[in-house]
C-alpha cells in the first residue's frame, strides 16, 4: 500500500488549480483511513454489486472493528474446516486415483477435487466466483435432459448414486444473471444411451450465456477462465458449450483454436451422445482480467495469455496487412506511402472513442493536442461487430492508448508490455476504473495512468449547481444503489477535457515512450557491435 504524507505548501491562486488540489487531498484522506485487512474483505464482498462497494466506501472507518471480527471468524472457521483434511487424510493403497493435472510444486492435495478417483464426480463449490465439477470415467452427454451422465461400473455398489447440479458460468454471486444460465445435472447411472461419438480427450463444459456480448465479460468471464481451466491440456480437449452462438465463434474462433484442436460442441443443438474419458464442468476464474500464476501449472500468467492472443491474431493481422499493401500499390499513391513512412517514426496513440454516454465532447481538440505533442493519432470506435483482429492490430502497434472508462478498455489486453494506458475516469467511477482496468493493466506490465476528471470537466457540471452532491460527493450518490449510479454517472455523463491539464499527461506519456525507444535503440546497437567486430576480424 502506498503511504501518503501531508504536505504543507503555498495556497494556489488559480481556481482550477485549487479544485484539482482539493480533489487530490480528498483522495489522500480516503487512502489514509483504509485498513489493509478490511480492504481485502471489503473487496471480496463488493464484487456482488458495483454500487454496494462504492456506496459503502465512506463507512469503512465505522465498520472496521466489525469487519476485523468477521475476518477473524472466517479465518478460524476455514482452519477448523480444513484441519481434519490436512492432518488425517490418508491414501488408500487399493484406490485408483486420477489427479486433475495439479501444479507440480503446489500443495494441491489440500484443495477440494485436486484428486479425483476413477468413476467419480467431485464438485468444488468453495470459490466465491464459480463452481467447478470434475467427472472421471465413462462420461456421456444427454442433451434432452440437460444432463451429463457418469456410467458406473457393474462392480460399483447401488447406493453410491451422485446427482450434482451446476450452472457453468463464472458469476456465481450474481443471482439475477445466474438464473438465466442453463442448469446441468451431473449424475452417476447404471445404464445410459450408447455412444454416438467417442472422444479420446477430455471435455470442458461452459456457458456462453449471461453477459456474453459485452467485450469485458467475454474476456473476464469467458476467455480468460477458459484459458485458466484448459491450457494445461495442450489443446487436446473438446469444448462443450451451453447457449452456443455462431457469432461468438466467429468473433473468438481465433483464440478458441489456440486452446483446442477440436471443433466445439453445441450441447443443446447436438442431440447425439458424446462420450469422454473425463470432463470439467465450469471454469476457474482468479480475478478481474488477470491470472494468478501461483494457482497455475508452470506458473502461467496473464502475460502468457497475451502471448496466446499474439499467436491467435497474427495470421489474420498479416492478411490485413497484405490487403492494405495491395490496395496502396493499386492506388499508386507515392505521396501517401511517403507520409506513412515518415509517420512510422512518431510514437503512435490510439484514442478509443465513445459515441453514447461517457463520450469525449472535445475529442477533436484532444487529437490536435496529442499531435502537437508529437504523437501520430488514430481514433477507433469499436462496435460489437468490429473484427477483434483489427482492434488488436491497432493496439498491438501503438505506444499509448487513451479512453474513457467503459467496456472498451478491456482492449488493453492487446497492448504490448510497457506501453502506456491512460484511462479517463469520469465522476463516480473511481473504484470501478481501478478495479476492472487499472490494476489488471499493471499486472500485464503496462504503464497505467488514471486521469481523474475534475467536476468542471463533466457534463454534469453544466446540469447541476456547483455545490450539488452529485458533483461534490459521488460516493454518497453511489450509496443510493446501482440504478442511481448507472443513471447518473454511467449513462448520464460525458466529459470535456481541460486540454491544458490533459496535455501534461500527454507530455509525460510522450517523454516516457521516447526514452524507452532510445534505450531500445541503444541496446540494439550494443548487440550489433560485437557482430560487426567479428566480421572485421574475419
Describe the predicted segments one by one.
Residues 2-22, 27-538:
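The feature primarily captures lumenal catalytic ectodomains
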